[in-house]
A protein has these predicted regions:
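Glycine-rich, aromatic-flanked loop segments that form ligand/cofactor-binding clefts
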Residues: 70-78, 111-132, 139-158
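A recurrent domain-boundary module in secreted/ectodomain proteins
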Residues: 443-464, 491, 559-566
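A short alpha/beta connector and helix-capping loop motif
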Residues: 135-153, 219-235
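Cellulosome-associated attachment modules in secreted, modular CAZymes
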Residues: 20-23, 465-566
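Sec-dependent N-terminal signal peptides of Gram-positive bacterial secreted proteins and lipoproteins
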Residues: 4-23
Length: 566
C-alpha cells in the first residue's frame, strides 16, 4: 500500500512538474549558478575585477558575467574619501563608512541580491592599512571624527626601506599608517566587515595586506577581523619582507596563509613576462614550492596596479597577451585567478572612478577558460611545456597556450596520461584535437589559446575482444550465434541519461524520481548520469532539469554531453 501511494505521488509530481516546465517556455526564467556551471564558493572559482565600475553597472552585467563563467566579482573600495574622482582616491579612505562614486549601501544590497540569483559571489576591496593624509603622517581634514586619535596610528614616519619588515608594517606608505594592533581600530574594521556581510557580500580583498603585521609580530589584526564564513585574500606584492632572506619571507607567507589567501605576484608576473617575451618558462609556481596550498593563492594576468599605476608595465601589453597568461593561470588546479576589466585609459591620472571598463571578459577565449576551470574542480592536474607551448592537463581536458604564435598545428604531451583518449573540440576555435595515451594533436587558432573541452568529447572507439567459440557436444542442438550488443564506450557517460539507454527522454526524469522514493536503485554509472545539474548530488532538481530540457528550455548546459567514466 505504501509503495502504491508513493507511486501515485510520483506520477502526480511528474505530471505537475512537466506541465510547469512546459508552460514556462513562454516565460522568462531565472538562471542559477548551476545553469552556468559556476563554482559554489569563491575559493573554487575565478574572479572578475570590475575595477572602478559602479555597482549598478556590475548589476546590469551579471547575466554576461555568469555566462562568462566567473564565480566572483571584485568591486573597488566602497569606503568614503575626500578626493576627486581619480581612481587612486578610492585607496585613500577617510574611515570605515560605505558610500562613494562606486555606490551606496543600498546599491550594494541590490547588487548582492541580484548576484545571488545568478550564483555570482561579491568580493569587496577593503582598505584597512591606512587612511587619507600625507606621507608624513598628517591626517586629511575629512578623516572621520572617531578616528582622529593619535593612538590609532603608528606615527613612525615614512617607509624608506621596503626590504625592512619593521618599516613595511609600521611606517607610512604615502598615507598615515593605522595602528592595526589597537583594539579600537580592530573593532572598527571588524564592524565594517560585518556591515558588508549583512549587505550580502561574500568575500573581502585586503588591500596592502603585507603592510599589516601578523601574530608572530605582535599583531592580532587578521585573526580578529576576518570572518571565517567569508572568503578572504590579501594583496601581497612581491614578498612580505621584500628582498630579505628567503627563510624570512617563506615563514611570513606561511603565517599569512594561516588566516587569509594571498596573491602570488611572483609566479603571475613570471608567466605574463614569458608571454611578453614570447618564450617558455618551466616554473610551476612560486609560493607552492614552499608548501603553500594552491587553494590559498590568487593568480592574475595583470592587476589594476600593473595596469593603472604610473610605472605599471602591463599597460604596454595587448589584451591578447594578458588573455594568454590568464589562460595558463586560470586553468590551474585549486587556485583562483583574477581577470582585470581594463579601464578605458592607461594614463594614471585619467582613470576615473565610476567609469565602466572593458567587457572583453565576455570573449570566447576567456569564457572557455573559466568554464574549463569550473568543470575541472577537484580533478587532478599535470603541467609542463612542449613544442613551445604551455600545457595544463587536467583529468578530462587540457589547456594549451602558445606564447609566441597563433594559427599553428601542435603536438604536445598528454602529461601523465590524464586526458582520456578520443577526439575533442577546442572550445575557443571550434577545431578538433586528437588525444592518445601520450600525445595531444590539433590546431591552435588565432588567439593562441586552445581549450580541450571535457564536455565536447568523443571517446576513442574500443574493440570488443574476440573470443574463440567453444564447440558444442555433437548431441546438443546447434546454438544460434550470439551477437554482442552495441554499447556506448564504458569510458564515458551522457549527463541526464539516467537509464543509460543512450538518449534523453522523460523516462530518465522518472527514473530519478523513483530512485529518490527508493523504488529503484541507480548504479554508480547511472548515478553520475542522473546528476543533471552537476552539483554533486541527486535531487528533484535533476529530474526538473531534464524535464525543462525536454520542454525546450535547455538552461542546463551539461545535459546531453559526455564526461569520463569512471
Amino acid at each position: 500500500m505504501k509503495k502504491r501511494f508513493i507511486s501515485i505521488l510520483l506520477c502526480l509530481s511528474l505530471v505537475l512538474t512537466f506541465v510547469i516546465a512546459a508552460s514556462a517556455v513562454t516565460k522568462d526564467t531565472a538562471p542559477t549558478g548551476a545553469d552556468y556551471g559556476l563554482a559554489k564558493t569563491c575559493a573554487d572559482g575565478n574572479i572578475l575585477q570590475c575595477f572602478n565600475w559602479k555597482l549598478s553597472d556590475i548589476k546590469a552585467e551579471l547575466p554576461n558575467i555568469a555566462k562568462a563563467g566567473f564565480t566572483s566579482v571584485q568591486t573597488s573600495p566602497l569606503q568614503r574619501h575626500d578626493g576627486n574622482s581619480t581612481w587612486y582616491w578610492l585607496y585613500q579612505p577617510t574611515g570605515f563608512s560605505i558610500g562613494n562614486e562606486i555606490g551606496s549601501l543600498n546599491d550594494l544590497k541590490s547588487l548582492c541580491t541580484e548576484a545571488d540569483k545568478y550564483g555570482v559571489k561579491i568580493i569587496v576591496d577593503v582598505v584597512a592599512n591606512h587612511l587619507a593624509g600625507g606621507n608624513n603622517g598628517s591626517w586629511a581634514g575629512s578623516i572621520e571624527s572617531e578616528m582622529r586619535q593619535s593612538a590609532y596610528f603608528h606615527n613612525q614616519g615614512a617607509c624608506s626601506d621596503y626590504n625592512n619588515r619593521y618599516d613595511l608594517i609600521y611606517k607610512n606608505i604615502g598615507m598615515p599608517d593605522l595602528n592595526t594592533e589597537n583594539s579600537f581600530v580592530i573593532s572598527k574594521v571588524k564592524s565594517y566587515v560585518q556591515q558588508l556581510k549583512s549587505a550580502g557580500v561574500d568575500g573581502i580583498r585586503w588591500d596592502a595586506a603585507k603592510h599589516i603585521g601578523l601574530p608572530s609580530e605582535g599583531c592580532n589584526f587578521f585573526p580578529s577581523v576576518i570572518d571565517a564564513n567569508m572568503y578572504n585574500y590579501g594583496e601581497v606584492l612581491e614578498a612580505p619582507a621584500g628582498n630579505s632572506a628567503a627563510a624570512v619571507n617563506n615563514k611570513l607567507v606561511k603565517e599569512y596563509t594561516d588566516y587569509i589567501g594571498i596573491t602570488d605576484e611572483p609566479y603571475s608576473g613570471t608567466i605574463t613576462g614569458a608571454i611578453r617575451d614570447k618564450k617558455i618558462v618551466k616554473t610551476k609556481g612560486n609560493w607552492t614550492t614552499i608548501g603553500v596550498g594552491a587553494d590559498r593563492l590568487v593568480y592574475w594576468g595583470e592587476s589594476h596596479d600593473t595596469f593603472s599605476n604610473g610605472d605599471g608595465w602591463t599597460k604596454n601589453l595587448t589584451q591578447n597577451q594578458i588573455d594568454r597568461s590568464y589562460a595558463i593561470l586560470a586553468s590551474r588546479a585549486n587556485s583562483q585567478a583574477l581577470y582585470l576589466s581594463r579601464p578605458s585609459s592607461s594614463n594614471y591620472s585619467s582613470i576615473w572612478t565610476g567609469n565602466k571598463g572593458s567587457t572583453h571578459y565576455t570573449s570566447n577565449e576567456v569564457a572557455a577558460v573559466n568554464r574549463f576551470h569550473n568543470a575541472m574542480i577537484g580533478k587532478a592536474e599535470a603541467t609542463g611545456t612542449a613544442n613551445n607551448c604551455f600545457v595544463i592537463c587536467r583529468e578530462g581536458g587540457a589547456v594549451i597556450v602558445s606564447p609566441a604564435s597563433q594559427n599553428i598545428d601542435v603536438t604536445v604531451n598528454n602529461i601523465s596520461g590524464l586526458v582520456p583518449e578520443g577526439t575533442y573540440t577546442d572550445e575557443v576555435s571550434g577545431g578538433k584535437f586528437t588525444v592518445t595515451s601520450t600525445k595531444i594533436t590539433g590546431h591552435i587558432g588565432s588567439t593562441g589559446i586552445a581549450v580541450i573541452d571535457p564536455m565536447k568529447f568523443t571517446p576513442a572507439p574500443t574493440t570488443a575482444p574476440t573470443v574463440a567459440p567453444t564447440a558444442a557436444p555433437t548431441a546438443a542442438p546447434t546454438a544460434a550465434p550470439t551477437v554482442a550488443p552495441t554499447v556506448s564506450p564504458s569510458a564515458s557517460v551522457m549527463i541526464g541519461d539516467s537509464d543509460l539507454d543512450g538518449d534523453i527522454t522523460i523516462v530518465d526524469a522518472t527514473r530519478i524520481q523513483r530512485s529518490l522514493a527508493e523504488l529503484t536503485v541507480l548504479s554508480s554509472k547511472a548515478s553520475i548520469a542522473a546528476d543533471a545539474d552537476r552539483d554533486g548530488g541527486i535531487t528533484i532538481l535533476d529530474a526538473t532539469a531534464i524535464q525543462r530540457r525536454l520542454a525546450g528550455l535547455d538552461t542546463v548546459a551539461w545535459i546531453g554531453t559526455f564526461i569520463n567514466y569512471p
